[in-house]
């Protein structure tokens, strides 16, 4: 009777999960989930609402806000990064760039009206005279990207994606059940720390590349069963290396 009851229970649970938008690929994965002792989570689009909005534009000397946004939107239309959609939407109507190339974890570049435009993180592009302003925005919980035109710094754009309201309670519940929670993000340490504080997450790993996330998750998995929750192509290696 037990041999029959267990599969039925698992199938029933998998069916119930689909009603909440959760797709479980196999009963084995469902069973492994019960033994998870460590949860690694991405920030953007996972802990946050996935409704990013442009909240600040800072133009460098000789440029203006509208120019900076238009150039950034032209190349970000081609990006798969969760925050790119916010910039593209804010600059709606901007012609798309040509000859676009994206490097995961760094940024994206292309030709806009014959000018070479690049949009990327402050780790990839030097903030120069805008460094102090960028750091202030990051400390407020905004994610900043820098925009260059023909190799010259044109400006910075701040994007904010609010924390999902249920996250603090979920983190507390997991901790009460003996599950450690860690944040893994490619974002800067200031923005990550600001959001982690709101979420109640104490273990924060920021400024990570996709391979860094995969390495950290592999390390977690060596000591305890680990689940990874992520979003986007940047998290694919880490997702593949997790227990679930």
Predicted region positions:
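Conserved catalytic phosphorylation-site environment of P-type ATPases
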Residues: 2-75, 218-222, 230, 238
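General structural feature for long, well-ordered alpha-helical segments within catalytic domains
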Residues: 10, 32-35, 53, 83, ...
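Conserved ATP-binding TGD loop and adjacent catalytic N/P-domain core of P-type ATPases
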Residues: 24, 114, 133, 141-143, ...
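Cytosolic catalytic regions of ATP/NTP-dependent phosphoryl-transfer enzymes
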Residues: 38-128, 142-154, 188-197, 234, ...
């Amino acid at each position: 009777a037990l041999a029959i009851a267990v599969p039925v229970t698992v199938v029933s649970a998998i069916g119930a999960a689909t009603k909440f938008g959760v797709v479980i690929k196999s009963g084995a994965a469902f069973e492994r989930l019960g033994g998870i002792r460590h949860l690694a989570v991405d920030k953007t689009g996972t802990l946050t609402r996935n409704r990013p909005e442009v909240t600040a534009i800072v133009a460098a000397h000789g440029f203006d806000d509208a120019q900076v946004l238009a150039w950034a939107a032209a190349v970000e239309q081609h990006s798969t990064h969760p925050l790119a959609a916010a910039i593209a939407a804010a600059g709606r109507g901007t012609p798309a760039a040509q000859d676009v190339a994206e490097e995961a974890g760094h940024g994206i570049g292309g030709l806009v009206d014959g000018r070479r435009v690049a949009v990327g993180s402050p780790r990839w592009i030097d903030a120069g005279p805008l460094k102090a302003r960028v750091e202030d925005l990051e400390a407020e919980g905004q994610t900043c990207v820098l925009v260059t035109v023909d190799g010259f710094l044109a400006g910075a754009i701040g994007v904010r994606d609010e924390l999902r309201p249920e996250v603090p309670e979920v983190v507390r519940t997991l901790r009460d059940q003996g599950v450690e929670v860690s944040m893994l993000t490619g974002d800067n340490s200031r923005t990550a720390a600001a959001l982690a504080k709101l979420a109640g997450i104490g273990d924060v790993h920021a400024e990570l590349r996709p391979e860094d996330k995969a390495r950290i998750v592999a390390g977690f998995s060596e000591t305890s069963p680990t689940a990874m929750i992520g979003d986007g192509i940047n998290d694919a290696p880490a997702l593949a290396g997790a227990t679930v």
